[in-house]
Curated annotation (Swiss-Prot):
<dbReference type="InterPro" id="IPR031310">
    <property type="entry name" value="Ribosomal_uL5_N"/>
</dbReference>
<comment type="subunit">
    <text>Part of the 50S ribosomal subunit; part of the 5S rRNA/L5/L18/L25 subcomplex. Contacts the 5S rRNA and the P site tRNA. Forms a bridge to the 30S subunit in the 70S ribosome.</text>
</comment>
<dbReference type="GO" id="GO:0019843">
    <property type="term" value="F:rRNA binding"/>
</dbReference>
<comment type="similarity">
    <text>Belongs to the universal ribosomal protein uL5 family.</text>
</comment>
<keyword id="KW-0689">Ribosomal protein</keyword>
<dbReference type="Pfam" id="PF00281">
    <property type="entry name" value="Ribosomal_L5"/>
</dbReference>
<dbReference type="GO" id="GO:0005840">
    <property type="term" value="C:ribosome"/>
</dbReference>
<dbReference type="InterPro" id="IPR020930">
    <property type="entry name" value="Ribosomal_uL5_bac-type"/>
</dbReference>
<keyword id="KW-0699">rRNA-binding</keyword>
<dbReference type="GO" id="GO:0006412">
    <property type="term" value="P:translation"/>
</dbReference>
<dbReference type="InterPro" id="IPR031309">
    <property type="entry name" value="Ribosomal_uL5_C"/>
</dbReference>
<protein>
    <recommendedName>
        <fullName>Large ribosomal subunit protein uL5</fullName>
    </recommendedName>
</protein>
<keyword id="KW-0687">Ribonucleoprotein</keyword>
<dbReference type="GO" id="GO:1990904">
    <property type="term" value="C:ribonucleoprotein complex"/>
</dbReference>
<dbReference type="Pfam" id="PF00673">
    <property type="entry name" value="Ribosomal_L5_C"/>
</dbReference>
<dbReference type="InterPro" id="IPR022803">
    <property type="entry name" value="Ribosomal_uL5_dom_sf"/>
</dbReference>
<keyword id="KW-0694">RNA-binding</keyword>
Length: 178
């Protein structure tokens, strides 16, 4: 079991129950899933770019990504419906906790000029979305084997009802929100 999951069960639940005066342990917000998304618009011309992006995503997440396809044709972007244009991974359970632990303790501190993540990125329902400009902040990615620096979107979905509850949950994990 991941250390962060143990920490959540042992101290975060009690801390949040006291802070928000929940009557039941089941009311305490929890992390439900983490979704990683990498849009590779250049994959229209070169299929190898999408394969490399999917390989990077598999290394970062520990599971095989789903190739996302264009929902509709857009002439301005030169894409047709059904073209593969990105990849995504949904992490749940142990892999989710391990990824969150690596993100907080290893990956985010490796970002250049890092001053914390934006507090405005909550969606109103306690979920948090952020973008990472470089996939090389993850220690699993070998810098010498990277063909191109790509960014990815990370969405942390929680069972919190409000942004305040979601912020308190992530702050309890020492998530760097100012």
């Amino acid at each position: 079991m991941a250390k962060l999951h143990d920490y959540y069960k042992s101290s975060v639940v009690a801390e949040l129950t006291k802070e928000f005066s929940y009557t039941s342990v089941m009311q305490v917000p929890r992390v439900e899933k983490i979704t990683l998304n990498m849009g590779v618009g250049e994959a229209i011309n070169d299929k190898k770019l999408l394969e490399n992006a999917a390989a990077d995503m598999a290394i970062i997440s520990g599971q095989k990504p789903l190739i996302t396809k264009a929902r509709k044709s857009v002439a301005g972007f030169k894409i047709r419906e059904g073209y593969p244009i990105g990849c995504k991974v949904t992490l749940r359970g142990e892999r989710m906790w391990e990824f969150l632990e690596r993100l907080i303790s290893i990956a985010l501190p490796r970002v250049r000029d890092f001053r914390g993540v934006s507090a405005k990125s909550f969606d109103g329902r306690g979920n948090y979305s952020m973008g990472v400009r470089e996939q090389i902040i993850f220690p699993e990615i070998d810098y010498d084997k990277v063909d191109r620096v790509r960014g990815l979107d990370i969405t942390i979905t929680t069972s919190a009802n409000t942004d305040a509850e979601g912020r308190a949950l992530l702050a309890a994990f020492n998530f760097p929100i100012p």
